[in-house]
């Protein structure tokens, strides 16, 4: 046997031992985990949640299985985390910032506006989470909330668009003159801090409010979810660059007692599948949003605009000011933000410069596509 074949054989054997059901796994008790989502099971986030579940099932030889339940199946949406804590359901699925009422630091994990005011995007936030102390702080978050939860960060679903408008906005003065639906909580409050007439309302209420003239503009998410909501029917001016939810993360909450009863192999399988889900989600959403945006522009006549540059400075500065206030009031919030600041001071100067070439390359290609004549029918 030559050296290359010997090395390949050893590598294959090691991989088999790492992931094949061993004696301990074969003897493990079967566990069924019910996951109640806070959103309908038709949502893209649930599609990727089911992929995560499938990966865990395959890695554990189906000794761990899942049932994904729609919002409200067992308890009301707002009670999801408490229900998992008490063991009424084994797991829940939402965005971390849903629970900022229990602890403001949840915002720094689920939806830090303007990347915590530090310029973090989805990729750099995941870098902080995996390699700069973020995961340990995430685990501590549940202890700070005093809930019996083991959390798994699964899905970076941002960046979200600034939003839609009935008429173009060319300056912050224009923006301040529009009644604009924003996310609830801290991101929406920061809009108010910079003078925007921010209105918080549920997703199902947005389109009727636009049709009745109650709103002049709105944000929800990104091209595909926005398309599903039908915003293109009443608004044609779309601004993709926004800061209120440039980083948005969805995660899984597992009851702590259920977690402790899993074997080490089963626990590792969940951790491996969760890490894989981070990249798979980014890849999936780039493709889905790209397809939706193409349809919005070519079929629905939606016009894309660049967000006024003054917006970025004003929103970022207001975010930092708000976060300094929370830091003064809450030691754990400060601990998390200080960790993100230390990471950003090192990583963001590199990452921001490196992304310029990607942005220029993408813009150049988009410009080429725009010059091509439309295909004949």
Model-identified regions with their sequence ranges:
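Divalent-metal coordination cores built from histidine and acidic residues
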Residues: 124-127, 138
């Amino acid at each position: 046997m030559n050296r290359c074949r010997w090395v390949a054989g050893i590598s294959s054997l090691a991989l088999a031992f790492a992931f094949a059901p061993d004696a301990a796994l074969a003897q493990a008790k079967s566990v069924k985990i019910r996951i109640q989502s806070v959103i309908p099971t038709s949502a893209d986030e649930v599609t990727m949640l089911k992929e995560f579940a499938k990966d865990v099932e395959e890695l554990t030889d189906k000794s761990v299985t899942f049932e994904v339940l729609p919002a409200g199946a067992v308890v009301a949406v707002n009670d999801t985390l408490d229900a998992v804590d008490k063991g009424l359901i084994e797991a829940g699925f939402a965005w971390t910032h849903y629970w900022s009422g229990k602890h403001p630091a949840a915002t720094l994990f689920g939806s830090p506006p303007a990347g915590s005011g530090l310029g973090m995007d989805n990729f750099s936030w995941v870098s902080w989470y995996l390699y700069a102390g973020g995961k340990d702080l995430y685990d501590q978050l549940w202890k700070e909330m005093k809930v019996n939860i083991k959390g798994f960060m699964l899905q970076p679903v941002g960046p979200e668009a600034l939003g839609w408008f009935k008429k173009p906005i060319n300056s912050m003065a224009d923006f301040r003159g529009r009644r604009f639906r924003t996310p609830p909580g801290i991101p929406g409050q920061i809009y108010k801090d910079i003078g925007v007439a921010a209105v918080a309302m549920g997703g199902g209420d947005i389109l009727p409010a636009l049709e009745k003239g109650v709103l002049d503009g709105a944000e929800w998410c990104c091209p595909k979810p926005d398309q599903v909501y039908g915003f293109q029917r009443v608004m044609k001016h779309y601004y993709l660059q926004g800061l209120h939810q440039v980083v948005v993360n969805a995660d899984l909450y597992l009851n702590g007692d259920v977690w402790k009863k899993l074997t080490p192999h089963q626990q590792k399988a969940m951790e491996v599948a969760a890490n894989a889900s981070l990249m798979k989600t980014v890849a999936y959403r780039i493709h889905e949003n790209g397809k939706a945006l193409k349809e919005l522009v070519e079929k629905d006549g939606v016009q894309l605009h660049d967000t006024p540059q003054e917006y970025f400075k004003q929103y970022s500065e207001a975010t930092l000011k708000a976060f300094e206030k929370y830091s003064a009031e809450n030691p754990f919030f400060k601990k998390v933000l200080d960790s993100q600041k230390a990471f950003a001071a090192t990583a963001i100067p590199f990452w921001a410069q490196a992304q310029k070439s990607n942005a220029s390359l993408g813009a150049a290609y988009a410009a080429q596509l725009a010059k091509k004549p439309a295909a004949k029918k």
